């Protein structure tokens, strides 16, 4: 839900298209609606600029479908992360607009924002092909939040010349998300080459001493390159959220400056 939804209800009451009693029924579920197994945060977009997203892991397909049905009453689009094909089948039964991005393990309901809603551009860069599932979680989530996405995959430090060939594309981004496992060195390299904020995402890819992504996480936290923020292991979605907030704030500031000129 966003402020447009509430304004629309109030305008309908003002114009006589809707009664006060009908408006009350719609508004009384705010700021959240209790489904028993889930409490839907209807005001999250109003507070934070980002709608609530469903974390699919640990939820049954029926629970996910029920949450989607409820959220679609007040949200044009819904995103479900860490979702399997059984969850997708359940969601598709209640909403035919659902689509499944298998590599990202994401279900999209209601499509993606149109051009007028785009707030910025993000480059999603991976060290290796094995990092792509986490990168796709970041990329699809970023598209859901209204960002243009450039995907640059398999440009890790073992063949650094591959990165240099794509540097022009990376440098045009407002935010760069770097996804890397093993020793996680790519984030530091990119951080030393671009002027945009870098969001580093360590992945659990690697052999024994990578400790399921801990080595990459610690390497990224200890980076000597400036302007790098680090997400939790395999958290591509979190990187997209942060990138979206950065871009949305930049656009809001630009719009305000233009209005004051």
Q: Residue spans of the language-model regions?
A:
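Glycine-rich phosphate/diphosphate-binding loop of Rossmann-like nucleotide-binding domains
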Residues: 117-161
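Long amphipathic alpha-helical segments
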Residues: 1-84, 88, 94
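Glycine-rich oxoanion-binding loops at beta->alpha junctions
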Residues: 106-110, 148-169, 214-215, 231
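Glycine-rich phosphate-binding loop
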Residues: 165-203
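C-terminal binding/interaction regions
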Residues: 126, 130, 164-171, 175, ...
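Short glycine/serine/threonine-rich phosphate/pyrophosphate-binding segments
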Residues: 62-64, 131-136, 160-161, 180-190, ...
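Short, structured coil segments at secondary-structure junctions
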Residues: 94-96, 193-194, 224-226
